[in-house]
Amino acid sequence: MNKQEFYVLIERDEDGIYIGEVPQLKACYSQGETIDELMQNIREVIELCLEEIELESTSEFIGIQKVVV
């Protein structure tokens, strides 16, 4: 199986838990008490997400922009 590359957006909530989201895969989220734990968990979630969808339905991650209002 070919390796695929995904980006993970990481935030920390008010309780100090790290939350990760994969923008290329809809509804692909996980969390962990450390970034290492989050990354291990998100790998498992990505594998599950890929089993549920066809590769053509993934979107291409373009980037992140900051907006000041």
UniProtKB/Swiss-Prot annotation:
Q: Which Gene3D superfamilies match?
A: 3.30.160.250
Q: Which residues form a coiled coil?
A: none
Q: Which GO terms describe its biological process?
A: regulation of DNA-templated transcription
Similarity field: Belongs to the UPF0150 family.
What name does UniProt use for this protein?
A: UPF0150 protein ssr1258
Organism, by scientific name, is Synechocystis sp. (strain ATCC 27184 / PCC 6803 / Kazusa)
